[in-house]
Amino acid sequence: MHKGMLVVVSGPSGAGKGTICQEIRKRNPNLFYSISATTREKRVGEIDGVHYYFIDRQQFEKMIANDEFLEWADVYGNYYGTPKKPVFEALARGQDVILEIDIKGARQVKKTYPEGVFVFILPPSISILEERLRKRGTDKEEIIVKRMQMAWEEIANCDWYDYLILNDDLETAVNDLEAVLTAEKLKPKRVNYRVLLEGGVLER
């Protein structure tokens, strides 16, 4: 009945987009969650092929040259990118796909796949965002300062997204994202009317 739908979830570092996406996956096991490739070091608890594909710069640059990314960016000296092939294969199977990427990557996807659904996650406040980043304990002070500057810029330029979700309560934010998925699936452009007619669902 439904075509595969590409959902792009973005937000400042520390806004909680990763946690929200994890909860959505638990509720919707049939969703295809795209795994990004990166050249950054693994953080404690991260698993290669689960959280990211951890590769070296040479391999990443080879993939760029071969046009293997749907989007990619250099973020604070590390490459991040979304491999194109698994995303388009999942969409072709009729699976809905979740991409958790930054705003630069989202803009790239918007140009190449404008029919996607674009969702921006807002933090409760800038001060709480900074507190979350510091609690991580994974970044040096100069990186935290850069992330905060970037957060201001991203929030100031997020009005082109289809949906804005405030993450001041995790369960509410997850419910909001699930409501977005449900509403988008019901839009006429995503419904295959021929299947409805041939299946006898719609009768005169």
UniProtKB/Swiss-Prot annotation:
SUPFAM superfamilies: P-loop containing nucleoside triphosphate hydrolases (SSF52540)
Keyword flag Lyase: no
InterPro entries assigned to the protein according to its UniProt record, in alphabetical order: GK/Ca_channel_bsu, Guanylate_kin-like_dom, Guanylate_kinase, Guanylate_kinase_CS, P-loop_NTPase
GO MF assignments: ATP binding; guanylate kinase activity
Residues in Guanylate kinase-like domain copies: 4-182
Binding site for ATP: 11-18
Origin superkingdom: Bacteria
UniProt KW keywords: ATP-binding, Cytoplasm, Kinase, Nucleotide-binding, Transferase
This enzyme's EC code(s): 2.7.4.8
Subcellular location: Cytoplasm
Pfam families per record: Guanylate_kin
Catalysed transformations (reactions): GMP + ATP = GDP + ADP
Residues annotated as transmembrane: none
GO CC list: cytosol
Role of this protein: Essential for recycling GMP and indirectly, cGMP.
NCBIfam families referenced in this protein's UniProt entry, alphabetically: guanyl_kin (TIGR03263)
Family designation: Belongs to the guanylate kinase family.
Name of this protein: Guanylate kinase
Gene name linked to the record: gmk
